[in-house]
């Protein structure tokens, strides 16, 4: 298990522990009443985030994922899983090509774990999903307005826009989409389905 997996495992276990404490005792830490309003708000916010992570960790992983890039169908994706990359790396994800600025949505329900930048991915978003899986959206041209860590998301939630940030400069605009489980990266292509909105999916289920 690599360092990133260890960190996410720790977050999951901490979330489960916090959630279990509330379930068993029926209340949060009694010391919260002695905090200042700001401290109490921060404690409440942290608890809410841990609760979201805990509930997601207890759920079975999603068997199907909604296409994250608007206007792209699954059959348009050229399989790039495992392709050789610089430094002898294997490609641990799928590149989904589209025009710069094309909207990128969450492929699943979950909670935003990170909104930031790194050298390889450029502007990236991590979403924590059911079963503790992490969904990685990289090379974004920009983030969705007001998107922040801790936000609950659905397949209707805009995360950002297709771009070429990070080590994708000089390539056609695309989204690098990765999926990570406890054992490491898994190929997202077999899980992807053509995009439908969460509202439409709910209507189909309720028929």
Locate each region found by the language model.
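Surface-exposed, glycine-biased beta-strand/turn segments
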Residues: 23, 27-123, 155, 164, ...
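Solvent-exposed loop/turn segments at secondary-structure junctions
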Residues: 15, 83-84, 102-103, 117-120, ...
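A cross-family glycoside hydrolase active-site/sugar-binding cleft signature
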Residues: 78, 138, 178
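Positively charged n-region of N-terminal signal peptides that target proteins for export
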Residues: 1-6
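Conserved, short, structured surface segments that act as functional micro-motifs
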Residues: 126, 151-206
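Hydrophobic membrane-insertion alpha-helices, especially the h-region
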Residues: 8-23
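A generic structural motif
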Residues: 97, 128-130, 180
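Zn2+-dependent peptidoglycan hydrolase active-site motif and core
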Residues: 107-148, 172-174
